[in-house]
Amino acid sequence: MSIFDERHHSGSGVVAITIDEHDGTRPDIDVVPSFDYVRYDSSDQTRQHRGSKVFPKTGSPIVNYPQQQLDRGTAKNGRTNGRYKRFARALKSAENQLVADGTISDLPSYFMECLIWNVQDEILTGGSDLSAGFKSVLVWLWNGLKEENYVRTDWEEPNGLKYLFHPGAKWTPGDARELVLATWQYLDY
């Protein structure tokens, strides 16, 4: 089975609730209960970004901007002929296998999407096939995440409103480096 078509069941987590598939119903789905949230970027409250706020079982509330993420992700996926989403899923599939093998610790699915979001479109569309393209993506990520090259403000979430690596984030640049290296080795590149 290839990392480009694997699907994994993860179960309910800290934020999402999994609704299991039953005979005659759709496949398992994850549901996230949330509340409306508005971020104001001006003192007169004229510049705003609408999002959602979720309250996990443990820890601090989480603010997301799903519409901005959807709009920007859809645009990037179109610009890259579907490779943005495909490579995000491939990285998550590799991460799932690496976790199952005990090679790395489990990371949130959104983190894989965030990493691929930061890869330039021309890198995502390069390569003669998906494997060569994914290899180029891993090289780009590795080079950008090296301690001597890493600049925190160069990395953002797909919504464009939050830095990827910030105090309180569920992941670090070290987690990303470990994931990229382990994926490279797993795929025997």
Model-flagged regions — what are they?
Residues 2-147, 184-188:
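Catalytic cores of NTP-dependent nucleotidyl/adenyl transfer enzymes across multiple folds
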